[in-house]
């Protein structure tokens, strides 16, 4: 395989970095009136302004050269054609098949997967229609008013994010609840809000053996039966997203209400699959299909557009520039829309679980940085929390500012204030404020010279802080589909360039294995096992505390 450090463009970019690292965006804008026009892209209902980055035409040219040398176009084609690019698990990677609205064949191991994708989608639609229309009745012949999704990781983060983002499109009768944490308090809080007669539980676990999910599911089942009494009532109030038909049936769920997905769908890429059943229940089949349409639009742009005008590719390459050359170890997601407040958490899993890897596809140490730490918060709240660090801290931290052009509320003045802040922050991060500008401002306030000079260093902003401004014309299912697909493909492209597998997650496994051993010790089912002195002490502290 091609190793990043051996690519000619990798070295050329280091030389270019040495020559260009002192350039300031403020001056680049002053010298080039067409800068914003050149570094601007529109795809469907999304607009990307990437002009406020530490880049020029040479930077982008060399980054595109790097992408070609790393084999990005070929790897993209392999994914779309069903090749087993998840080499450590010997699996295809085909979340794009789930939103393949052209229905053109996508073949894995000699089988076109589209018929079974469409079959599950149709079954989801029929089930959602029954629940939403009120024809699906609980054990007391009442309609469903609450849906509780029990899952973890990709079985939770994606559906929760999308249902929250698209709340204005949700069914007015349905209240959506999501349970992922096994600590008990989250499930207890949800159960205190719902009624067994009108609640539908969705248990989302591919194997139906995930410890956290099954623990919560069994507790929910016990709570339900304490009220319903009759085991047969479970079938009216529980559905499953799984491939383990036997375990689902043993749980008491009617397998007619089991919705499958496949090993070529990774958890963090699965909201388009049956894992998205809560989304379809809440938004309806038509809006779910619109979400798929938006993702498909981005897929087609991604696979058919030259790298030089390819939105996910450009975002990926700019990220590479900061991570591998500037040493930017983190990346902020700041949506300026309260309904998008779950988006940073979703992208955090997407990026960090995909690209938080230390070895290349051939098992060698990477020798360079990979995934940054992804974090964030809604933009307005962030401005009053951590934007101080972004403006005047010592780290180079790229920021994605995400907003909608169309108002989401009829409250006068709110949206204009919101967008004014988005645009102002992007400008402030780029321009900064020079010492002379600070002096002039303070002098105009009548401040004496000595006090001015004391304050100048504190009120100066260096600027040159990078941002991507991502605008949706409106927040709707189609544009949300495009937005999430864009981030998926960005993550994939960065993984290609780093030479890593973006589609496994072996780092999740070690802690699970050790937890099984320790659980036996905490419950008394097994004797003491050999651990380090710290872990032994922690186990003993728990046992002593709970003997009292």
Swiss-Prot record:
InterPro entries according to UniProt: G6P_Isomerase (IPR001672), G6P_Isomerase_C (IPR023096), Phosphoglucose_isomerase_CS (IPR018189), SIS_dom_sf (IPR046348), SIS_PGI_1 (IPR035476), SIS_PGI_2 (IPR035482)
Q: Which domain of life is it from?
A: Bacteria
List GO terms (cellular component aspect).
cytosol
- Give the pathway annotation: Carbohydrate biosynthesis; gluconeogenesis; Carbohydrate degradation; glycolysis; D-glyceraldehyde 3-phosphate and glycerone phosphate from D-glucose: step 2/4
**EC numbers, comma separated:** 5.3.1.9
Which residues act catalytically here?
Answer: 353 (proton donor), 384, 512
Could you list this entry's UniProt keywords, alphabetically sorted.
Cytoplasm, Gluconeogenesis, Glycolysis, Isomerase
One short Pfam name that applies is PGI
Record-level Gene Ontology MF annotations: carbohydrate derivative binding; glucose-6-phosphate isomerase activity; monosaccharide binding
Entry similarity comment: Belongs to the GPI family.
> What does the record give as the function of this protein?
Catalyzes the reversible isomerization of glucose-6-phosphate to fructose-6-phosphate.
Q: Which HAMAP family match?
A: G6P_isomerase (MF_00473)
This chain belongs to the protein called: Glucose-6-phosphate isomerase 1
- Organism whose genome encodes this protein: Neisseria meningitidis serogroup A / serotype 4A (strain DSM 15465 / Z2491)
**High-level lineage:** Bacteria, Pseudomonadati, Pseudomonadota, Betaproteobacteria, Neisseriales
